[in-house]
A protein has these predicted regions:
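N-terminal basic/disordered segments at the start of proteins
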Residues: 1-34
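Cap/lid and interdomain-hinge subdomains that line or gate substrate/regulatory clefts
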Residues: 2-6, 39-40, 100, 104-221, ...
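N-terminal beta-loop-helix "entrance" segment that forms/cooperates
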Residues: 37-67, 207-216
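Short, well-structured alpha-helical segments in soluble
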Residues: 55-69, 88, 247-255
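Short Gly/Thr/Asp-enriched flexible loops that form oxyanion-binding sites at enzyme active sites
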Residues: 78-93, 270-282
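C-terminal catalytic subdomain
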Residues: 133, 285-401
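Long, internal scaffold/assembly segments composed of regular secondary structure
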Residues: 221-222, 228-309
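Extended hydrophobic packing segments that form well-structured cores
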Residues: 358-466
Length: 466
């Protein structure tokens, strides 16, 4: 599972009980550690370990940056000091979780010790004034289930934001000429999102494969992995090319400091190596290095986002929306020539030939059924959005490639969204419900969430703890 560091920032206000604020900052820190959160505390910033003065901001910022914090939690141990919270949040520029523990029953004489809820109202407004996006977790008790759920969902949001803003994609050759739908604006991706591409020509990839094939130790290990992972249904003399391509792509990803890749797939690669790249893609995808087809840069971005939203617990499946189910009005075939990781398959994949080409190197296997999230990051004309929603695996006719028949709530609505854009026929599926996390992450990365199901109010209700 991916690791996320949370900066823990408890805050108080002078007119309410300092001892009670100190008590709750300790209880909250203990609870966060109990549920497995890696926190960076401010208990060394001052004697109370609380934020309530401008002088605390600089040392907190310095500490959090040195520790590599990925997001911060503004914990209102009492009412809190809203303007100091906002100044800190703006200076850090990280995702913000706003929360305060539910207030106790007032004292017999009517005295209230904390008024944490009231402080949340104030801080929410001031964060807006400072134009700081934030995530609100409902005012609840530390032992309430929505506390643990909300914290972990926020950590997943932080993971999406961190991954998105640090994306660098290995682009292996140009897009295929016939695939105008996969064109992207490299300059705009860099200017708006800090998403970088590392383009290399096909000749560099082919040479890297030749170099890999000359490495006997690396080849022996990869060939053993292939024999263990796949049922081999292609000529034995073609398997080393699959192994060499997998090794080469991994080395190139590391050489250029990338976290994903996109490959041309056809036809130049077949002229040089005599194979399709699908199985090699699947091997890297299983490693947590998304490699997508047809040089689909936006598809690679989607794969990174979807896996980050699940904290790396499951692997994504880069797929085509292809044809409608012959019997189910809301059924659709997700399929591609074979880049899906083995962990997603319901059976041992066959290393074989693809549907539309004569060269070996594809995989065939039906994916596991179950509940899924489907997503697609895309854009055109300067506007970017994230199409997302739920689906479930269903039975259907046997297929070729890696495939899964799925059912959605309303296929006609989804179909119209894809056609009318800015999306294309590619998406990424994952065996997890990460719709709320992706929806919330969009506010931090400057894109619009676009739900293809009529569930927006349900998603908002989930996020606020209902």
């Amino acid at each position: 599972m991916d690791k996320i560091k949370l900066g823990f920032v408890p805050t108080r206000r002078s007119i309410f009980s300092a001892p009670d604020a100190i008590k709750y900052r300790g209880l909250t820190a203990d609870r966060l550690r109990e549920i497995g959160v890696d926190i960076v505390d401010i208990d060394d910033i001052n004697d109370e370990g609380l934020l309530f003065d401008d002088s605390h901001i600089e040392p907190i910022v310095k500490k959090f940056r040195a520790e590599g914090v990925d997001g911060i939690m503004l914990c209102h141990a009492n009412f809190g000091t809203e303007y100091v919270c906002a100044r800190l949040a703006r200076e850090l520029g990280l995702p913000v979780l706003l929360w305060g523990p539910r207030d106790e029953r007032p004292e017999p004489d009517g005295t209230r010790l904390r008024d944490s809820q009231c402080g949340l109202f104030a801080t929410g407004k001031v964060l807006r004034r400072f134009q700081v996006p934030f995530t609100y977790m409902t005012n609840c008790r530390l032992t309430d289930p929505e506390f643990e759920r909300g914290v972990w969902d926020f950590l997943a949001v932080c993971n999406v934001v961190k991954t998105f803003k640090r994306t660098r994609i290995l682009q292996m050759a140009t897009r295929p000429f016939d695939f105008w739908s996969t064109m992207c604006n490299e300059g705009e991706l860099l200017e708006r999102f800090n998403i970088q591409l590392s383009p290399i020509p096909m000749t560099e990839l082919v040479q890297a494969v030749r170099d890999a094939q000359a490495d006997e130790q690396a080849m022996a290990a990869m060939l053993a992995h292939i024999a263990d992972s796949f049922e081999i249904c292609i000529p034995e003399d073609k398997v080393p090319a699959v192994a060499g391509l997998a090794i080469a792509m991994k080395r190139l990803v590391e050489k250029y400091g990338c976290n994903a890749g996109a490959i041309q797939c056809w036809n130049a690669l077949q002229d040089e190596l005599g194979i399709m790249p699908c199985a090699a893609n699947a091997i890297l995808n299983e490693m947590g290095i998304p490699i997508v087809c047809e040089t689909d840069i936006h598809g690679a971005i989607t794969a990174l986002m979807v896996e980050a939203a699940d904290l790396g617990r499951h692997r994504g499946m880069f797929a085509d929306w292809t044809v409608r189910h012959p019997d189910n009005e809301n059924g659709e075939l997700l399929q591609h020539c074979g880049p899906w990781p083995c962990s997603c398959a319901a059976v041992k994949p066959k290393l074989t030939y693809p549907l539309a080409f004569d060269h070996p190197g594809a995989l065939t296997a039906e994916a596991k059924h179950g509940d899924l999230t489907l997503a697609r990051f895309d854009g055109d004309n300067g506007e970017y959005s994230l199409l997302l929603g739920n689906a479930r695996g269903i039975d259907g006719p046997a297929g070729m490639g890696t495939y899964l028949w799925v059912e959605v709530e309303n296929l006609k609505r989804l179909e119209a969204k894809i056609v009318e854009g800015p999306y294309i026929h590619h998406c990424v599926a994952i065996h997890a419900n990460v719709v709320p996390v992706l929806y919330e992450a969009c506010k931090y990365i400057g894109i619009q969430p676009d739900l293809y199901d009529s569930i927006e109010e349900d998603v908002k209700a989930y996020l606020r703890g209902e």
